[in-house]
A protein has these predicted regions:
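Class I S-adenosyl-L-methionine
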Residues: 1-134, 215, 220-223, 233-251
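Short secondary-structure transition/capping segments
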Residues: 81-87, 107-117, 149-156, 182-195
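Short gly/pro/ser/thr-enriched loop/turn and capping motifs at secondary-structure boundaries
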Residues: 38-41, 142-145, 171, 191-192, ...
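General beta-strand structural signal in soluble alpha/beta enzymes
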Residues: 33, 63, 106-108, 137-140, ...
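Class I SAM-dependent methyltransferase SAM-binding "motif I" and its flanking Rossmann-like core
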Residues: 109-179, 234-236, 251
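Alpha-helix boundary recognition
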Residues: 26, 96, 149, 177, ...
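A contiguous loop/helix-start segment that scaffolds small-molecule binding in enzyme catalytic cores
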Residues: 4, 173-251
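Short, acidic/turn-prone active-site loops that include or flank metal/cofactor-
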Residues: 11-12, 36-39, 160-163, 167-170, ...
Length: 251
């Protein structure tokens, strides 16, 4: 393989795919999708719908099975490193089977730069090659952008910083001094519940027919979000959620 396009496709709506992304997609001979199991088949189906909508040239789609990951590790960083290494081996084996002049493509939810491991895994694949393929990255609409649009709001007040972090860090470290707005993605434990006086804008599976959004004071809507999130996981088989929590004015 001579070239791999890593293409951000937004939150799942084919209409969110940028013109630049469509142009990059139409240079691709073979798209690589990660099979995450039957419970998350819709994640593959969304990518397939995007290809059906935007591709104008012959192409193939190949899949590799996502290696298992320890979800309750003693050492979180080490567990993720092991998982990324297994992903890199699986992806490398698949790309090795393609012709030397082939152009590959990987469709990344949201934007490849934010809360996604694709580029890290691709770097590991390239590091093992004597003559590594070229990588070109096309940005996409991020889930925080899609969240803000769905709620018709902005992420920050005037002159206000925004912290983007994980649910785990929010639970363990709390909110740093001087931070009044926090964006979190993929938080199954709903860490915002620890901030009952703050205001939350929450959304899940944005850009898909199952999209849900809720907003309000955490003490008023927090438990409803927990229930809605659990119900969505039962119905759809997966949840990708994002939320913005903001400190009340004057606090």
């Amino acid at each position: 393989m001579r070239l791999l396009h890593v293409i951000g496709i937004g939150a799942g709506d084919p209409d969110q795919v940028t013109v630049a992304a469509v142009k990059a997609m139409n240079e691709v001979d073979v798209f690589v999708l990660i099979d995450k199991g039957s419970a998350k088949q819709e994640l593959v189906d969304v990518r397939t719908r995007i290809l059906d909508e935007h591709m104008r040239r012959p192409h193939r789609v190949v899949e590799f099975v996502d290696p298992p990951r320890d979800r309750t590790p003693r050492d979180y960083d080490a567990a993720v490193d092991t998982w990324h290494d297994a992903r890199a081996r699986a992806l490398g084996d698949l790309l090795d089977a393609e012709p030397d002049d082939a152009v590959g493509g990987m469709l990344v939810w949201g934007d490849p730069s934010l809360y996604d491991s694709t580029l890290r895994v691709v770097d590991r694949v390239r590091a093992r090659l004597d003559d590594p393929f070229e990588v070109r990255v096309t940005p996409g609409v991020t889930s925080p952008s899609a969240l803000a649009a769905a709620h018709g709001t902005v992420l920050n007040r005037v002159g206000e910083p925004v912290l983007t972090t994980t649910g785990r860090r929010l639970r363990e470290d709390g909110v740093p001094d001087g931070v009044d707005a926090v964006v979190v993605m993929l938080d199954s434990d709903c860490g915002f519940l620890a901030l009952p006086d703050w205001h939350v804008h929450w959304g899940a599976n944005l850009g898909t027919p199952d999209a849900v959004v809720l907003a309000g004071r955490v003490s008023d809507v927090g438990e409803e979000i927990v229930r809605v999130r659990a119900d969505l996981r039962r119905r759809a088989g997966w949840v990708m959620d994002t939320y913005l929590v903001r400190r009340p004015l004057g606090r």
